[in-house]
Design a protein with these regions (language model features):
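Intrinsically disordered, low-complexity, positively biased terminal segments
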Residues: 47, 65, 76-115, 125-126, ...
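Acidic carboxylate-rich catalytic motifs and surrounding loops in phosphoryl-/glycosyl-chemistry enzymes
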Residues: 109, 145-150, 191-195, 355-356, ...
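Acyl-donor binding region in acyl/amide transferases
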Residues: 66-150, 305, 312-377
Length: 412
């Protein structure tokens, strides 16, 4: 086997339809990361003049004359072919040792286990368990378990089979909230590069990326029609009408409860019901005040949320989503996701990747809300094999750990 640098065209031809490919292993992503302190190269593994594996390698200097590499979502090759993996690993280490690399970080999109959505128990794939052991023997350092979101990319992903997705496949809460009468004031529409700035306002608090990054992201992937920005547009006149009708109904129902409570002032259930209505009515009144303010500012329609997604082969991957938090009474995040997923189902895609969830399925999980929201769409839950460092130069690697440079680079 020979490992050598290959052209972008050679890389694209091999990788674009390979089963191991992801949007992280594309020349588009390489172009993007060139703008953010990474250099890049494409490598190919040839055996008997046949290309049998490739990878995008992002790299940067981390110390004088020392570099590290990153193969996002791993090398593109058959990991289960032991002989191939052994030879590829050996030749890759030799190739990058000559370039003064300390290590190459990888996080392959290879399934380690499938998690039962009800019992939350793992069904580990025996071949994947053997693979992890084999990789360790070959010099791949297995890193943190990444139960939450400690690593470069999520270890646990929720993926919807769009062939099976319908109104009966989601849980009841999800269906009710995504089909609420309030959603009649909402419309899903396709955005453009011009809308990224508005969209960024909804995601900036949960992303460590800049506005420029997302504008570049859209620009780069849009060249191949691989990216969509789907937005929610609200009609405030319709919204106001619906909210006023809802407020009238709730006030009438609260008056009925108040009358019952006056007749039974020591009934605790009635008291709790009354206070619950008081809170909901106060929230509605707050929203109506806010809508009236926007209408006075001549803002009859406004974008209030969106999803950035990548389309690749038969799969759509959610990159990031966000919503305007002004209206706590409007659960339009369910509407946003349900409509987006339905949109791609109609277009004929097979899978929708909801992106990462936490691997902690207990009640004490700090990301319980995120998990519950995504699981309400009844996805399949997969655990990938995790993040590894392929150590190229053990001396350099240990010095980098001992000096704290790796912690500074990767732990935020």
């Amino acid at each position: 086997m020979i490992i050598k640098e290959i052209s972008k065209n050679e890389f694209n031809k091999f990788s674009l339809n390979h089963i191991q490919n992801s949007y992280f292993q594309t020349s588009n992503y390489s172009t993007l990361m060139n703008n953010y302190k990474y250099d890049c190269l494409y490598i190919g593994a040839y055996k008997e003049n046949k290309l049998i594996g490739v990878s995008l390698i992002l790299y940067k200097s981390i110390a004088p004359l020392v570099k590290y590499g990153y193969a996002p979502r791993g090398f593109i090759l058959d990991y289960l072919d032991n002989e191939l993996l052994e030879e590829f690993t050996k030749k890759t280490k030799e190739f990058f040792a000559r370039k003064n690399f300390a290590f190459i970080k990888i996080n392959p999109e290879l399934i380690y286990s499938k998690i039962n959505i009800k019992s939350k128990k793992k069904e580990v794939i025996p071949e994947s368990k053997k693979l992890v052991s084999h990789m360790r023997e070959l010099g791949y350092q297995k890193l943190r378990n990444n139960l939450y979101f400690e690593a470069m990319l999520p270890k646990y992903n929720a993926i919807i089979n769009l062939k099976k997705f319908n109104k009966n496949s989601v849980n009841n809460k999800c269906y009710v909230k995504s089909h609420s009468i309030i959603n009649k004031s909402l419309k899903l529409k396709k955005g453009s590069l011009m809308d990224i700035k508005t969209f960024y306002e909804f995601i900036k608090e949960k992303s460590n990326k800049t506005l420029n990054y997302y504008e570049d992201f859209y620009r780069v992937f849009n060249k191949n029609d691989m990216v969509d920005l789907l937005l929610i547009d609200v009609d405030y006149y319709k919204y106001l009408e619906i909210f006023k009708n809802k407020l009238d109904t709730m006030c009438y129902e609260r008056d009925e409860i108040n009358n019952e409570f006056l007749a039974n002032p020591f009934n605790n259930d009635l008291y709790l019901k009354k206070t619950d209505y008081d809170k909901k009515i106060a929230s509605l009144e707050k929203s109506i005040t806010l809508i009236n303010k926007k209408l006075k500012e001549e803002r009859s329609k406004e974008i209030i949320g969106g999803i950035l997604a990548i389309k690749q082969n038969n799969k759509v991957s959610l990159v990031i989503s966000g919503v305007n938090k002004d209206f706590t009474t409007l659960n339009y995040k369910y509407f946003l996701y349900y409509k987006t997923i339905s949109y791609y189902k109609r277009l004929g895609y097979s899978f929708f990747d909801l992106n990462g969830i936490s691997g902690n399925f207990t009640e004490k999980n700090p990301y319980k809300g995120l998990n519950n929201f995504k699981l309400s769409f009844n996805p399949d839950i997969y655990e990938y094999i995790g993040e590894f460092d392929l150590v190229i130069n053990e001396t350099y690697y240990n010095i980098l750990w001992d000096s704290g440079k790796l912690r500074k680079e990767f732990i935020h």
